[in-house]
Structures are given as structure tokens and as C-alpha cells.
Design a protein with these regions (language model features):
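Short S/T/G/P-rich N-terminal loop/turn motif that feeds into the first structured element of a domain
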Residues: 1-65, 72-82, 105-115
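C-terminal structural segments of small proteins and small subunits
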Residues: 87-102
Length: 115
């Protein structure tokens, strides 16, 4: 699914986000993935803003534990996911966890008009 992007050229660059839903089947083996993926994400400026240790689904069905990871830009979020290192890290979670990841561009509201 693609959508048109708002023109934010006059504003500060919007951040990029990974919206992740993870179903972890083998927590002890999942640590192998996190020990590799965590530093790769951090190297791209990524940081976990929220994780679903405590979460309430108020509408619909959520396909796993939610995570929200922020990057300095949409391009950085894409670059991290597409990097050779992260693609290798994905193999560490095969059979251990299932992920659904959406990369989104943050919204930067237009600057206020002077009064």
C-alpha cells in the first residue's frame, strides 16, 4: 500500500518509525536476535520508544507484542531495515519469532502563521 506524502519541505525533517508486532515463540533463542539487532538499530540512530510489556488492545486484533522504534529520518529507518547486517539478523529469529513491520514517516505539522 502506498500513500502520497505531505509536503514537509518547509519544516524540520520528519522522523522515521518502525511499527513492529512480534510474536515470540522461543524467548531464550530470541536473545540471539536482540543481541545482534539492537546494536545495528542503535548504530542507525534507532531507539525503542515503546514496547508492549503493558498494552491494552482497545479495538481490532493485534498480531503480537507491539514495539515502536524511532529513527532520525524515514531514510534512516529504511536504511537500517535494508542493511546487510539487519538482513542477517533477521535469520536469527527464523523459527523463533514472527514479525510484522511497517516503516512510516513521522508527521511534522506545518509551522504556525505569525500573529
Amino acid at each position: 500500500m502506498t500513500t502520497s506524502r505531505p509536503d514537509n519541505s518547509h519544516d524540520a525533517a520528519p522522523k522515521g518509525y518502525w511499527i513492529v508486532f512480534a510474536t515470540i515463540n522461543e524467548p531464550s533463542r530470541f536473545d540471539n536476535y536482540t543481541s545482534v539487532a539492537g546494536p545495528l538499530i542503535a548504530a542507525q540512530g534507532g531507539r525503542v520508544l515503546a514496547r508492549g510489556d503493558v498494552a491494552t488492545v482497545v479495538e481490532g486484533t493485534v498480531p503480537g507484542r507491539p514495539y515502536l522504534i524511532e529513527f532520525p529520518s524515514y531514510a534512516a529507518a529504511q536504511a537500517c531495515f535494508n542493511s546487510a547486517g539487519y538482513q542477517e539478523a533477521i535469520a536469527l529469529r527464523d523459527g523463533v519469532a514472527q514479525f510484522q513491520i511497517v516503516i512510516v514517516e513521522g508527521f511534522v505539522p506545518p509551522a504556525s502563521s505569525p500573529r
